[in-house]
């Protein structure tokens, strides 16, 4: 469950390390975002020669949450940290690598590029 002011790790090699959610997209008063949802983020911490610079605003898709995601069989997949992948204007990932596991739910949300780049799909 990501809301405004939540900080997330970045799970791609776009150059950003930490981002802060500044808006949850998808409805005028939508409060929370879960795995597979798109949010607007501001880069709070970045590596020196990366594509993303501190202060830049990007769209991002949430790939891991502490709240987790519930499957139809009743199981819940949770993670230790919240993480997102930065997207460009066409909703394609900016980075060329994805770090850490992602969930199968991203496949339903048309983020096949992220699923194919991820080292592990849960």
From Swiss-Prot:
GO terms for cellular component: cytosolic large ribosomal subunit. SUPFAM superfamilies: Ribosomal protein L14 (SSF50193). The keyword Cytoplasm does not apply. GO terms for biological process: translation. This is Large ribosomal subunit protein uL14. Part of the 50S ribosomal subunit. Forms a cluster with proteins L3 and L19. In the 70S ribosome, L14 and L19 interact and together make contacts with the 16S rRNA in bridges B5 and B8. It comes from the Bacteria. NCBIfam families: rplN_bact (TIGR01067).
